[in-house]
Amino acid sequence: MSKIAKGTILTLVAGIAWGLSGTSGQYLMTHGFPVLVLTNIRLLIAGFLLVLYMVLTNRRKLVEMLKDQKAMMSLTLFALLGLLLNQFAYLKSIYESNAGTATVLQYVCPVGILAYTCLKDCVAPTVTEVLSMMLAVGGTFLIATHGQLNQLSVTPAGLFWGLFAAFTYALYILIPIQLIKTWGSISVIGVGMMLAGIVLTPFSGILRFHWQLSMKVYLALAGIILVGTILAYTLFLKGTSLVGPVKSSLLAAVEPISA
């Protein structure tokens, strides 16, 4: 299988997994889970499981990455500006509006990534890239709203958090590209999530949160942590390293279909 084909498949699967994550997150928030607590839970548990996997399977590579100061500086930026802010902003956007509106706003992101890539490389976008961008954003809009504008009832807070989610989503895609090529997606995602989760813990209220658990809550937590976080983030960033940030951000627009 070619590199492009493999990256395309990984990114599409990640987008589908993210759709489940958004649905699970919306269910948990309507059943008493605050946004910060939910963000903290998924970062800590997913990060711990990924780091544990690396300890058991490739401890030497994990230790080498942790000792590399340049890598850890980039990883810290990725953890705070990409993982932490993006997960919080997306869930906050859902909370302030709805899953469809939040998804449409977040997928303004590919436009920004294309603009950044063209400016960085000093090249103009191709006709194919522009058409793909229009089709992806337009398709996301139609899927999320069924073509009915009245389903996009955006409050000022919902608009802010949705656009902020798009910005942080771009950072999440762009910052770790070189890290993943060097150290692998599992190491980068695992340590990044652990760092972000630890930083958030004193401020999220998770230590004071009163858990009300049921089988449905367990299933929703499994959906958002195992499928929507560990699987989705790892596959997406690996796919991005293979097909590039512009194509991966367009392919991930399959998310609303699964949601």
Located regions from the model:
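Hydrophobic core positions of alpha-helical segments in small-molecule transporters
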Residues: 13, 41, 78, 105-106, ...
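Hydrophobic alpha-helical transmembrane segments of multi-pass membrane transport proteins
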Residues: 13-20, 24, 53, 73-96, ...
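Alpha-helical transmembrane segments of compact multi-pass small-molecule transporters, enriched
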Residues: 45-49, 105-119, 134-135, 195-199, ...
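Non-cytosolic membrane-interface motifs at loop->transmembrane helix junctions
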Residues: 37, 101-105, 159-160, 218
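Helix-coil boundary and interhelical linker segments in multi-pass alpha-helical membrane proteins
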Residues: 30, 95-98
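Membrane-interface interhelical linkers
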Residues: 1-13, 47-78, 96, 119-131, ...
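Glycine-/small-residue-enriched transmembrane alpha-helix faces in small-molecule transporters
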Residues: 1-41, 151-178, 198
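Juxtamembrane helix-start motifs in multi-pass secondary transporters
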Residues: 38, 185-189, 248
